Amino acid sequence: KSPESAKELVTKGSELSLRMLSFPQPIIIACSGHAIAKGAFLLLSSDYRIGVEGDFKIGLNEVMIGMTMHHAGIAIAKSRLSEVYLNRSVNNAEIFNSKQAIAAGFLDQIVPESQLMETAVKVAEMSSKLNKKAHAATKLKVRKPHLDTLKKAIELDLLSEISIDS
């Protein structure tokens, strides 16, 4: 694929993350297995992330495959990952199992696979009891600095070349 198509893909993915992070209602993800690259960014862009127990791979592999991490990716990672894991994840492309992914900040909870959907429904029911206006306003207030940074990062990525060294 061309650098232009890579830039378009990165931009669309970053804009999706921006929409998810600012979405007025809670976004709950039930992750039933691996979450690499954009899959991991989807986890980082959600409000509550439930994974399953097991030897699943979760993380940002961009540097490992020869892609210099884009500005928006760094902004998303900085806003959600534990500081201790940020460099390990972004700079070193370290991939985590489900349990490690909680400590890193990719997941909030892990459950046996047989309980994944039941747990997601319970979290959704809990979230449905939130006052919608208060939740949306609070989410935007908490995330404002990160959302502003992400918007600027997306603009910067549009002006930059995507660096992929295969």
Regions found by a protein language model. Give the residues of each.
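Glycine-rich beta-to-alpha active-site loop
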Residues: L16-I65
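Acidic, divalent-metal-coordinating active-site segment for phosphoryl/phosphodiester hydrolysis
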Residues: A37, A93-Q100
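Hydrophobic/aromatic residues within transmembrane alpha-helices
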Residues: L42-L44, A101, A120
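Well-ordered beta-strand positions
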Residues: Y48, R88, N92-E94, Q109
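Hydrophobic, secondary-structure "cap" segments at the distal end of domains
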Residues: G73-V84
